[in-house]
Amino acid sequence: MNRIMLLAKIHRATVTEADLHYEGSCGIDEDLLDAANMREFEKIELYNINNGNRFSTYIIKAVRGSGIISLNGAAARKAHVGDHLIICTYGSVPDAEVNNHVPKIVLVGDNNSIKEIKKI
């Protein structure tokens, strides 16, 4: 049997852009993607710290070093520029590996810069 487990989390990312008329997705600075081991087109769950909205979409790459977190399409209705988000990926982990599974956590500071990377 497998369990769905947290793989990675970007914590307290600040929304920098929201474009309702874009096709969809969430643009994330490539530095953050690399730090969290997240991939373009991967499904993500997002939790808006400001208003409690929870929603899912997929990742597209934003310019490396830009600090961009952009919500596009329908996701743009779930948060405003300046809102703080928790961005998570989950995956299937075999029961035999669950006790050794360690998610990667990226804590974000000002301008969506990487403040700390840790494993919990």
Swiss-Prot record:
<dbReference type="GO" id="GO:0015940">
    <property type="term" value="P:pantothenate biosynthetic process"/>
</dbReference>
<protein>
    <recommendedName>
        <fullName>Aspartate 1-decarboxylase</fullName>
        <ecNumber>4.1.1.11</ecNumber>
    </recommendedName>
</protein>
<comment type="similarity">
    <text>Belongs to the PanD family.</text>
</comment>
<dbReference type="GO" id="GO:0006523">
    <property type="term" value="P:alanine biosynthetic process"/>
</dbReference>
<keyword id="KW-0456">Lyase</keyword>
<feature type="binding site">
    <location>
        <position position="57"/>
    </location>
    <ligand>
        <name>substrate</name>
    </ligand>
</feature>
<comment type="subunit">
    <text>Heterooctamer of four alpha and four beta subunits.</text>
</comment>
<feature type="binding site">
    <location>
        <begin position="73"/>
        <end position="75"/>
    </location>
    <ligand>
        <name>substrate</name>
    </ligand>
</feature>
<keyword id="KW-0210">Decarboxylase</keyword>
<dbReference type="InterPro" id="IPR003190">
    <property type="entry name" value="Asp_decarbox"/>
</dbReference>
<feature type="active site" description="Proton donor">
    <location>
        <position position="58"/>
    </location>
</feature>
<keyword id="KW-0704">Schiff base</keyword>
<comment type="pathway">
    <text>Cofactor biosynthesis; (R)-pantothenate biosynthesis; beta-alanine from L-aspartate: step 1/1.</text>
</comment>
<keyword id="KW-0963">Cytoplasm</keyword>
<keyword id="KW-0865">Zymogen</keyword>
<keyword id="KW-0566">Pantothenate biosynthesis</keyword>
<keyword id="KW-0670">Pyruvate</keyword>
<comment type="function">
    <text>Catalyzes the pyruvoyl-dependent decarboxylation of aspartate to produce beta-alanine.</text>
</comment>
<keyword id="KW-0068">Autocatalytic cleavage</keyword>
<dbReference type="Pfam" id="PF02261">
    <property type="entry name" value="Asp_decarbox"/>
</dbReference>
<dbReference type="GO" id="GO:0004068">
    <property type="term" value="F:aspartate 1-decarboxylase activity"/>
</dbReference>
<dbReference type="GO" id="GO:0005829">
    <property type="term" value="C:cytosol"/>
</dbReference>
<dbReference type="InterPro" id="IPR009010">
    <property type="entry name" value="Asp_de-COase-like_dom_sf"/>
</dbReference>
<feature type="active site" description="Schiff-base intermediate with substrate; via pyruvic acid">
    <location>
        <position position="25"/>
    </location>
</feature>
<feature type="modified residue" description="Pyruvic acid (Ser)">
    <location>
        <position position="25"/>
    </location>
</feature>
